[in-house]
């Protein structure tokens, strides 16, 4: 069986140009693609080297998203970065972008009001991974569940994804 391998520049050349998403993050993606090509990589995957650049790319893609934002996080804190990205996500939803947010339930404890508020938005869907059955009792419920056979609570979602469809 023949496998066709594409480098990042080849894949980018096949994409239709001119979407809002392309204009917002095109330079950053072209830079990553060029670095992949120089290194002879067969995939277009590259790490973003620092937090500031990663933040900028996420904010730009939220602003440029046209159809959907699919977000998956182990932890989304209420710090400055979390609040700023949350604002960008809410603005995208207000523009009509469908937002799906999947969070690990352990780090969603204590944030029920914020998450419930987001979930009332017609364009935002909030889901919790591996929900705590006794979550109504907060952190005490988590500890009780661990004490009484909460072996499943050790299964956490450590993934992070920010996928925008422009």
Locations of regions flagged by a protein language model:
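N-terminal localization/anchoring segments of enzymes in phospholipid and broader phosphate metabolism
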Residues: 1-165
């Amino acid at each position: 069986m023949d496998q066709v391998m594409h480098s990042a520049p080849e894949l980018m050349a096949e994409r239709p140009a001119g979407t809002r998403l392309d204009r917002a993050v095109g330079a950053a993606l072209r830079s990553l693609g060029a670095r992949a090509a120089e290194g002879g990589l067969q995939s277009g995957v590259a790490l973003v080297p620092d937090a500031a650049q990663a933040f900028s790319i996420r904010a730009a893609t939220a602003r440029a998203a046209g159809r959907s934002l699919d977000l998956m996080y182990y932890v989304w804190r209420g710090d400055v970065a979390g609040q700023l990205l949350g604002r960008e996500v809410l603005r995208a939803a207000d523009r009509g972008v469908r937002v799906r947010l999947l969070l690990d339930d352990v780090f969603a404890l204590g944030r029920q009001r914020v998450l419930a508020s987001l979930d009332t938005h017609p364009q935002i869907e909030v889901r919790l991974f591996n929900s705590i059955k006794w979550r109504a009792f907060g952190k005490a419920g988590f500890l009780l569940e661990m004490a009484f056979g909460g072996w499943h609570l050790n299964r956490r979602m450590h993934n992070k994804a920010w996928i925008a469809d422009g």
